[in-house]
Amino acid sequence: MTAITASMVKELRDRTGLAMMECKKALTEANGDIELAIDNLRKSGQAKAAKKAGNIAADGAITIVQDGNKAILVEVNCQTDFVAKDENFSNFAHTVAAAALAAGETDAAKIAELKLADGQSVEEARIALVQKIGENIQVRRAKIVEGEQLAIYKHGLKIGVVVSYTGDADTGKGIAMHVAAFNPVAVNAEAVPADLIAKEKEIAEAKALESGKPANIVEKMVTGSVEKYLNEVALDRQMYVIDNEKKVADVLKATGTNVANFVRFEVGEGIEKKAELSFAEEVAAAQAAAK
């Protein structure tokens, strides 16, 4: 049997990023053949990734990469905030975002097939990262924003915004911050999706009818409720985050700025999360997983 030296373990660790003991075990099983050890580790990584795929990944980070008049927002999910802050996770997310922007690709399934600079596909890099970190990791969604001027704002790892606009740069930055804070649905009332307005109208009608008031009064109540809703979700009607005595529309007009569109991503939007376990339940789950 080939003797496993420290230099062999170091080389395998440098090439895979895995722990020393895991590298030594892989080399022992491969009788010192580094290439075979790497192949075996990849196979075990695929198995581990498949096993982890059932775990809910609702944490993670929003990554934004800009290239000229284009920028991409990418949400990459993991299971814990601890991993979201990990440098390996961050590097993976940035690499994926850069590759997706260069390819002009926003479909998650097609992003998985993209080739990276080291020759790996995004999916192969994801599997390797799952093996290294030990959590389910998923590239969930991506969106490209194009425009003459772009303003980018990130609130920590969890919220990212890109605004396409023309006009004053400081106002553009302020609007990006505002979108992060107030989460508007659309640039103006006219752009609010019809299905959202219809849903709000339906709710307002049900409430108004319960009042038992005449039909003409009910109609006014519904109109007022819908108008209030539009004031809350249309960007131009909201009170500006930097100066809450002014509406966004007034700020845009005063600075000669026009917002074409925006995209806001927040980590975990729409993902159903499991109820948090108690400490005792966490310990029991960990013991069960170790068996």
UniProtKB/Swiss-Prot annotation:
The annotated region (Involved in Mg(2+) ion dislocation from EF-Tu) lies at 80-83
Cellular component terms, GO, for this chain's entry?
cytoplasm
Q: Where in the cell is it found?
A: Cytoplasm
- A GO molecular-function annotation: translation elongation factor activity
A single Pfam family it belongs to is EF_TS
InterPro entries to which the protein is assigned, alphabetical: EF-Ts_dimer_sf, Transl_elong_EFTs/EF1B, Transl_elong_EFTs/EF1B_dimer, Transl_elong_Ts_CS, UBA-like_sf
Arranged from A to Z, the UniProt key words for this protein are: Cytoplasm, Elongation factor, Protein biosynthesis
**What does this chain do?**
Associates with the EF-Tu.GDP complex and induces the exchange of GDP to GTP. It remains bound to the aminoacyl-tRNA.EF-Tu.GTP complex up to the GTP hydrolysis stage on the ribosome.
**What PANTHER family does this protein's entry cite?**
ELONGATION FACTOR TS, ELONGATION FACTOR TS, MITOCHONDRIAL
Q: Which family does it belong to?
A: Belongs to the EF-Ts family.
The protein here is known as: Elongation factor Ts
